[in-house]
Regions:
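Short, flexible, glycine/charge-rich loop motifs used to bind or transfer phosphoryl groups or to couple energy/partner
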Residues: 13-15, 79-81, 97-98
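SF2 helicase motor core recognition
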Residues: 89-104, 119-127
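Glycine-rich phosphate-binding "P-loop"
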Residues: 1-8
Length: 195
């Protein structure tokens, strides 16, 4: 993002995302996922749109992910055949960041911990089949991050990314992120047994 301090506008972000043929958007709050899904679906005329959250029962979530994978395969096949694919958009909470094998050409991630952003980036051109590199966009949502560790991780990422580094996933930055995160994290060792 141009600034790690300036929140986006949901409507403008939805317009931008809806302009892509295929995009995965990941946010940290269920309410954000529902709102952004509603806005994208209203703008993405003719597109297939899905919403994923941990509130879905496991079978429904699995069925939806299988449907998304099938749509992604059809999307890639249409592009390979020189045809116009049916646009598709997924808005999800962070449940897709680990253990869910999705491969999108464009991924949007709400500002979060560096580890979460890296996991989200792993859903972009995951299989390396795109003719050009995929694109990962980080945005600052207009809502507050959930309290606790998620806020601490987001704030630590903001501190490490000050000045918007050329390579946001450079190993020295990742090392610094985890050192700061674990140093600043509230301890569960109330009796100081580990000291």
């Amino acid at each position: 993002p141009p600034s790690l301090e300036t929140p986006c506008n949901w409507q403008e972000l939805a317009d931008e995302i809806a302009g892509h043929d295929a995009a995965l958007t990941i946010v940290s709050r269920r309410a954000d996922a529902a709102e952004l899904f509603r806005l994208i679906k209203a703008r993405a005329d003719g597109a297939r749109c899905w919403h994923l959250s941990a509130l879905m029962c496991a079978q429904h979530r699995s069925d939806t992910i299988a449907e998304i994978k099938s749509a992604l395969t059809a999307h890639r096949e249409a592009l390979a055949a020189g045809q116009q694919p049916v646009p598709l958009h997924v808005v999800s909470t962070q449940l897709v960041e680990a253990g869910v094998d999705l491969d999108f050409p464009v991924v949007y991630r709400a500002l979060a911990g560096l580890d979460s952003i890296a996991q989200a980036a792993g859903r972009c051109n995951r299989e390396g089949k795109l003719p050009v590199p995929g694109a990962v966009h980080v945005f600052v949502p207009p809502t507050k991050a959930p309290p606790g560790l998620l806020t601490l991780a987001r704030d630590t990422c903001k501190a490490v990314w000050r000045g918007l580094p050329a390579d946001p996933f450079a190993l020295p930055l990742i090392d610094l992120y985890f050192k700061r995160l674990y140093h600043d994290a509230p301890s569960t060792d109330k009796a100081r047994i580990c000291d």
